[in-house]
Amino acid sequence: MSSMKWLSATAVFAAVLPSVSGFCFPEPKELNFSRVGTSSSTTFTETVGEAGAEYIVSGNASFTKFTNIPTTDTTTPTNSNSSSSNGETASVSEDSDSTTTTPDPKGGGAFYNAHSGVLSFMTRSGTEGSLTLSEIKITGEGGAIFSQGELLFTDLTGLTIQNNLSQLSGGAIFGESTISLSGITKATFSSNSAEVPAPVKKPTEPKAQTASETSGSSSSSGNDSVSSPSSSRAEPAAANLQSHFICATATPAAQTDTETSTPSHKPGSGGAIYAKGDLTIADSQEVLFSINKATKDGGAIFAEKDVSFENITSLKVQTNGAEEKGGAIYAKGDLSIQSSKQSLFNSNYSKQGGGALYVEGDINFQDLEEIRIKYNKAGTFETKKITLPKAQASAGNADAWASSSPQSGSGATTVSNSGDSSSGSDSDTSETVPATAKGGGLYTDKNLSITNITGIIEIANNKATDVGGGAYVKGTLTCENSHRLQFLKNSSDKQGGGIYGEDNITLSNLTGKTLFQENTAKEEGGGLFIKGTDKALTMTGLDSFCLINNTSEKHGGGAFVTKEISQTYTSDVETIPGITPVHGETVITGNKSTGGNGGGVCTKRLALSNLQSISISGNSAAENGGGAHTCPDSFPTADTAEQPAAASAATSTPESAPVVSTALSTPSSSTVSSLTLLAASSQASPATSNKETQDPNADTDLLIDYVVDTTISKNTAKKGGGIYAKKAKMSRIDQLNISENSATEIGGGICCKESLELDALVSLSVTENLVGKEGGGLHAKTVNISNLKSGFSFSNNKANSSSTGVATTASAPAAAAASLQAAAAAVPSSPATPTYSGVVGGAIYGEKVTFSQCSGTCQFSGNQAIDNNPSQSSLNVQGGAIYAKTSLSIGSSDAGTSYIFSGNSVSTGKSQTTGQIAGGAIYSPTVTLNCPATFSNNTASMATPKTSSEDGSSGNSIKDTIGGAIAGTAITLSGVSRFSGNTADLGAAIGTLANANTPSATSGSQNSITEKITLENGSFIFERNQANKRGAIYSPSVSIKGNNITFNQNTSTHDGSAIYFTKDATIESLGSVLFTGNNVTATQASSATSGQNTNTANYGAAIFGDPGTTQSSQTDAILTLLASSGNITFSNNSLQNNQGDTPASKFCSIAGYVKLSLQAAKGKTISFFDCVHTSTKKIGSTQNVYETLDINKEENSNPYTGTIVFSSELHENKSYIPQNAILHNGTLVLKEKTELHVVSFEQKEGSKLIMKPGAVLSNQNIANGALVINGLTIDLSSMGTPQAGEIFSPPELRIVATTSSASGGSGVSSSIPTNPKRISAAAPSGSAATTPTMSENKVFLTGDLTLIDPNGNFYQNPMLGSDLDVPLIKLPTNTSDVQVYDLTLSGDLFPQKGYMGTWTLDSNPQTGKLQARWTFDTYRRWVYIPRDNHFYANSILGSQNSMIVVKQGLINNMLNNARFDDIAYNNFWVSGVGTFLAQQGTPLSEEFSYYSRGTSVAIDAKPRQDFILGAAFSKMVGKTKAIKKMHNYFHKGSEYSYQASVYGGKFLYFLLNKQHGWALPFLIQGVVSYGHIKHDTTTLYPSIHERNKGDWEDLGWLADLRISMDLKEPSKDSSKRITVYGELEYSSIRQKQFTEIDYDPRHFDDCAYRNLSLPVGCAVEGAIMNCNILMYNKLALAYMPSIYRNNPVCKYRVLSSNEAGQVICGVPTRTSARAEYSTQLYLGPFWTLYGNYTIDVGMYTLSQMTSCGARMIF
């Protein structure tokens, strides 16, 4: 069958057109009229000659209402407006009944230019001109204008082209060359159409015809085949038009040049404009393209080359449509919009792609204010698209362009019976090519470039039935230096709801929000999609990149980019030197992936750096990575994901029909290759990544670096609620917040298949994340958190099985695993469902978790792992805060770092579980903490049984909860750790369990980890922890070695409230170790433990050892207490119950099947204020069967000589240790009423056994054993409870007969629990009297029997005031059980005070006691200590010195010679005074020193110029220090001195020769002072812990008279004065009597010291004048003999003994020397500064005195 082709017809003009010379340019033609095609005329169409035409438009010119479209007279009614045309004629067929008028398809109804000349329209300068072309409908190309040459529109005021139609192309304008519009004020192209009429369906299929046959039959075949589309839209039909464009036949006689072959363009394209050359619209104000349409491509514009819009104020392209591509514009070349203000592409549509723009070349948006592409559509949206059989296709539908499926093979707008294409289609009719419908807003086959947009680039509300709802870019997309790039509310039926790209997308230097919001895609990439494994989205210098509320039905709700998404900021300028600036934000929020991975973004690498903030929040994914999916190993392949969907759609719903047509119809070769290459490149991506540049983070698929604020919150997914990655690194972030994310399986916040690294963060917060199985906050194979500057917070994260149903574990039923596999099958790339560890890691899950070098407060609080699943399976619930499958390491070298674990929990809603509930805060097989840490109120719990039948104690498979704070296998803690308020069944604070993840030793691959808890090199506090069964610490092996260790107020139901162990435990103190206030709550054990009988009594033990069945039946658990650098103390550890237990069973420190060893270093103590009540599994009646209790045994050449104390000071202490005790070194102290029961006891030489009154040392009834005492010390600091005839309760050495039924193996069932060990040294052979035999029930007593009275209380007992026999030791009543030899009494036998007497030892024990004879001598109240008494007497010299210093100030300052030269004024003086006196020791006195300081105030007047009179008041505060000859006491004394003085001076002359007038000048100065001095002294006696206090007063007088004679007086030329003087100085100090208080007081009588001195000396004085300031200086030297003095003698009496004596004061020698210096500085007429210094030097004394102050004259 030959194909039919519609051939173009040539219009024949009736009149000959005037010829235009080709050798000259045409004259411009005025265009100032309007034409309306209303009558027969030949002048409607302007025909252009060969040279072209230039039209000068003035006024309003218009061409309207013309058509050459034929109509059928018999079938088509004519319109009243279409009966004639303006000035044109036509040749019409005469047979109106059967013939249809058919024109040649000629174009250019208004202007026709068939030549290459230029056709231009313009206005003259300064005039206005508008051109309107409307309602012109033509069968040919260019409804209004056809131009073979260049077409120009220049400087028109208005250009309106509307309602025009072409039945070929170019509904308004068709240009064979370039088309240019410039300088247009307003250009409007509206309602123009390029519509190819639909062919008429033939009743019968015609045979193939030749060209001539076709010509001959065309008249009969054309009538039924033409149906005007315009008539269906109520446009004029013009059936009877008379025009030269209409001929009688449909087929021309000959073809033109353009018709000899298939046209290069597509008929039905370019609804308004069709340009074969470039189309340029520039320098215009308003340009509007609206409601234009085309049945092929380019609803408004079709250009075979470039399209350019430049410098346009307002460009609006809206409501245009195309049946195929380019709803507004189709450009085969490039499209450029530049230097314009407003550009709008709105509500355009196409059915096959490019709803607004379809460009085969590049698109360039540059230098624009704003450009908006909105509400455009690509595809068919009116009806569901289905593929129909060709026999059913309708060919006569007038609306075929709107309803035909784009999936049809022709690609055109009509479908014929035979499937043939319309004329001009270049598609092969033998192939069916599917419609693409790509790019709802724009489509480009090459690149899209956006530059320098200052307002906004908005691509919004566009739709596409294929990919790229907003835009389709096959090449690169580059956007730079622009403002507000936004893709809003676009949608796609496939990938890329906002934008679909097949090459790299680069965004740089964008301001405002770069926004992808509310875009949707039915496949991948709701907001953005990039095809290809090597294409990336790269962003640099963006203010804000936002993916908000985008949705995809497969992967990448916000964006799908296979290779990489990166955003960073770079700057060449450093705002602050050395600091790289940050700028911009990333916002990924509210995006959804309803059927796949990556709710926010899905990419193989996400790199964000140098940004101000990042927010990934509110995103969701049906599979993995709610916020971001970056894992390359499980990365989904977009095309691979399409194929199963397409295949299934072929047999499913009608909605899938378009996809079926695309996938199963004959595809283009490019489609096939893209599928193949994408799958191949996806598989090859790991190898490619290895060849990348050597970036240290190259293998990191998620990188967030150098960001101020990062938030990942409220995202949801199956895995990785916030982020799903392979390797993730977040570094150098000021604030990182991961909160309120959720995942149904693993990784609520972040999930990484391999590693997660958080480094150099200032603040980290991971809060309120939720997961169904593992890792509420973080989940990774390796988690490394390091170098955090201000700590972090993990709070209220939760792993809760109830959120997902059943978590798969090794013990989970197969049905649960099958359901999970079925869910995973929704994504083909999903791996097989893994076996999960259970509900683990409320905050963090990892195989290896490491925290290092973090500073500040690092907090885990309120995190939970919960199994609330009602299924029958029992899950492991472990690690409320952290679960590390292999190891956890936490370390910090910063002393300010503190890790806090508070309120974390693991729990199950079941009362019985076979799953292991462990680690309220931490679970890991290997735990290493080397940092300060606090664990408080963490819990591991099960639901309370409702009935007794639900109690898991009866079933061996039911497991107890372990480790309220920490659970693991090998746990090591160092630093400072505090555990408080934690709760679990076993190990309320720390518990161990066998590691299920480690292969057993039998596997041969590796050895299992040994269960052990190690606390070392730090301080550890355990307080108020609660164990529902046993132990704040629970482990087979425990090693504690720390500075300060405290177990306080921990509780447990059974023994072992502090520590429960089954193999060995070592506690070594480097500081203080304290077990206090730990409580056991149950009287009887409710169930049997290994090696125990049912209902065994609890003792309230803080430490409990039970080897169970883990060791041989005869082996006890080993406990070693080692006080190496600190003390170990057990006190108030108790059994508290309401059953009225006796005190003997209320307090206990250690119990269980324990082999005990005690070692204390020198000066250190192990104190048991609670009893030790251990048992043993050894059985036998001889002592050598039992273990040895080594006390202070030397180890590794380290001697242990400390003290072991058993005390009943707080409550009764009866300790039972079934071992052979050997005291190797040091001291064992049994305090008052304390009992120690051992199998045997041996005291080695050099050790010390101290027993207080009432103490008992005994063997046990389970075996024969001796008590060998080699030196016993009895502490008499207390009396005990003496019986009649006893001064104190003597200690007892007790022997107990062995019972035949004794069995150590019975443990606590025996009345005396046991745990003995064999003595290491067997009894040597030799004399029975001197060689003890350890297997005998006998007491061996030898060596020194030492009595000590450390407090001196014993000898104050009045019973010692007479002679008597004193029992010292209680012994067995059977003398055969006692052997005493070589015993010597020693110690405190001669007291320093109290009842004095002598002791005589009776070494033969009688009637069960050893006693001594006391003979009374005398009684002494005070301990004697030699004292000297010089201190009190020597204080007199200090009092005298305090008065002399005041006198010296008055003489040298107030009464200075210079003052007598002054004018008579009144003076006020203020002085500061000080003195220091030191005296060496003399034969009569000890050394002492005195210093004092004070103030003096004086006022004086000069009644005459030669006379001064004044008064002064002074106060001194001093201290006296004595350097004693005997150093067993010292004095602390103080002194307060108050003095009042009167002084005066007179200057006179002594007449030597009256006749000659010779006279000597004399100066008389005098001072009288009275002083009252108070003393307060305390004397301390450290050696005897005593003191004295003494308070007394001194009264003093001092009188001084100085007479000076001038040898040289000042003259007019000199101020120098030389003086000799003599002085009389008298002082008297009287010390009042006083009595000491406190220790052995004494009474001292009065004593007095009087001294009269006669200083004689000379002085030199003079003035210095400088800068109007006068300084007057004086220097004096004197010899100072004492002409009278007494030696003060003080008598005293000791009150206790009436002993009397006297003290002679060590006074200075009689001769001494004195030097004085004084100065006065005159600052003016009213102010003077002054000062003086005096030094007295004697043989044994040195006294220095000074004063300085100011004088005011008034």
UniProtKB/Swiss-Prot annotation:
Residues 252-264, 402-412 have a biased composition (Polar residues). The keyword Protease does not apply. The keyword Transmembrane applies. It is found in: Secreted, Cell wall; Cell outer membrane. GO terms for cellular component: cell outer membrane; extracellular region. Residues 68-109, 190-235, 252-271, 397-438, 621-668, 1299-1332 are annotated as: Disordered. Its main location: secreted. The lineage of its organism: Bacteria, Pseudomonadati, Chlamydiota, Chlamydiia, Chlamydiales. It comes from Chlamydia trachomatis serovar D (strain ATCC VR-885 / DSM 19411 / UW-3/Cx). It comes from the Bacteria. This is Probable outer membrane protein PmpB.
